[in-house]
Amino acid sequence: MILIWFVKLIEKTVCKIIPQREQDEEYRLRFITGGMLSTAELSILQARKEINLFAERTHRMFGMVRDLLHTTNDNDFNKLFSRIEKYENISDNMEVEIANYLNQVSDGRLSSESKLQIRAMLREVTEIESIGDSCYNLARTINRKHRSDMDFTPKQYDHIHQMFQLTDDALSQMVSLVEDEHHVVDVNKSFNIENEINNYRNQLKNQNVLDVNNKEYDYQMGVHYMDIIGECEKLGDYVVNVVEASSNVKEKKS
């Protein structure tokens, strides 16, 4: 039990022994590649860092989706789409590897608090991977639109940009919260952004029916458009699930 008080000190020592690699696009695990550590608490801390990195990289993946929307050159588009596809595949692997590590930790002797932590962290990992899936779904919709001979109207682009900004705000807030060790990040901000996303989706859904009927754009472009808007709303739901899992365990710890 004495070791618990020195977890932070041991953690710093381990980080010096196992230096962090430079960020790359391989989505390689950084903190739990060496197997289980001397205590369950220290192993959980390392898994926490891996989840934080997973969240950051998924946020970066969404940034690629935003870039893809305005990439017109076919060669550049294909390269960026392939990069997003690669991120999605490795995101799947990260979910499995982190979950397997946490399940190994849970096989040991754990306090009730540690068991709650692991349960919440497993939920976080699942939902972060779902965010990666949503990013890939967005990229696939943009790809279908890119392969067609049609384009969104300026008004549609404006609405997509606004929805993308709300989604990016949600992801930024999520990353800040999962990395927050001192409970200073306001959880309610995430819920407020989610409400904004839901309300905006409903507004655009109703407006889309009117715009298609008024022949401002054809039905198929309306489908691509609403697929993007709807997927952003789903992504926002996954973000809130991560936030809830992370904030619940931190409340129990404090």
Q: Which residues does each PLM region occupy?
A:
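Cytosolic, long alpha-helical scaffolding segments
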Residues: 1-254
